[in-house]
C-alpha cells in the first residue's frame, strides 16, 4: 500500500498507528483506547508524565552531570521488561495461543541472565506492583511452556534459549521472599 499527501501549503499531517500481537481488532482497540480524542502533543505529554513518574521513584543528589547520567541510566534500565498485551488484556503466549492476563499486566523481554542480579531487585524496591506483575508474567510463561520452564530469555511470545543458567528461579524466589 502506498499513500501520497500534498503538504505543499504548509499543513501538517498527523498519523496514528497501533500494534497488537493478537490481531487487527486488538490493534484497533489499542488505538482507540490509547489515542481517541488526543493529538500528538497530548500523547507526548502523557508519555513524558509517565516516564517522569517512573524515574522520580529514586532521588539523587549531585552535579547536574551526575544527575543526568543517573536518570538516563535509570530510564534505560526501566525500558524492559515491556508491557506485552492489548488494552483488553489479551496477549500471545509462549505457546503461541491467545491468553488473557487477568489481574496482572503481562510483560515480555526478560533477559534474566542480564537482569536477575540487579534489575529485578531494583524493580521490587521501587515498584512492587510492577514487580508482582513481572513475576505473574514469568509464571504464565512457565505454565505455557512446552517444557514447563521459567523463561531463560523471553521475547515477545518466544523463548530464545540464548543464555546459560536458569535465573528465573532466582528472580521468582527473591520476589516471593520480599512479598
Pin down the residues of each PLM region.
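Secondary-structure capping and boundary motifs in well-ordered enzyme cores
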Residues: 65-66, 105-114, 160-168
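Beta-sandwich/jelly-roll carbohydrate-recognition scaffolds of carbohydrate-active enzymes
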Residues: 1-107, 140
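Extracytoplasmic/secreted proteins, especially bacterial periplasmic and envelope-associated proteins
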Residues: 46, 50, 65-72, 117, ...
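Generic recognition of flexible, low-complexity loop/linker segments
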Residues: 2-4, 107-110, 120, 158
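Conserved small/polar residues in nucleotide/adenosyl-binding loops
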Residues: 175-179
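Helix-terminus loop motifs that line ligand-binding clefts
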Residues: 91-95, 99-100, 130-174
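Alpha-helical support elements that line or immediately flank enzyme active sites
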Residues: 72-85, 108-132, 170-174
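Structured segments of extracytoplasmic/periplasmic soluble domains
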Residues: 57, 76, 121, 125-128, ...
Amino acid at each position: 500500500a502506498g499513500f501520497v499527501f500534498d503538504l505543499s501549503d504548509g499543513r501538517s499531517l498527523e498519523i496514528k498507528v497501533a500494534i497488537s500481537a493478537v490481531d487487527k481488532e486488538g490493534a484497533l482497540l489499542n488505538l482507540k483506547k490509547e489515542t481517541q480524542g488526543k493529538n500528538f502533543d497530548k500523547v507526548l505529554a502523557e508519555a513524558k508524565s509517565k516516564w517522569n513518574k517512573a524515574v522520580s521513584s529514586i532521588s539523587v543528589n549531585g552535579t547536574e552531570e551526575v544527575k543526568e547520567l543517573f536518570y538516563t541510566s535509570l530510564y534505560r534500565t526501566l525500558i524492559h521488561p515491556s508491557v506485552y498485551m492489548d488494552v483488553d488484556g489479551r496477549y500471545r503466549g509462549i505457546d503461541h495461543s491467545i491468553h488473557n492476563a487477568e489481574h496482572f499486566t503481562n510483560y515480555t523481554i526478560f533477559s534474566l541472565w542480564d537482569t536477575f542480579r540487579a534489575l529485578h531487585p531494583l524493580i521490587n524496591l521501587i515498584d512492587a506492583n510492577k514487580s508482582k506483575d513481572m513475576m505473574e508474567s514469568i509464571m504464565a510463561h512457565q505454565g505455557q511452556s512446552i517444557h514447563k520452564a521459567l523463561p531463560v530469555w523471553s521475547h515477545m511470545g518466544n523463548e530464545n534459549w540464548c543464555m546459560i543458567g536458569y535465573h528465573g528461579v532466582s528472580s521468582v524466589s527473591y520476589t516471593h521472599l520480599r512479598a
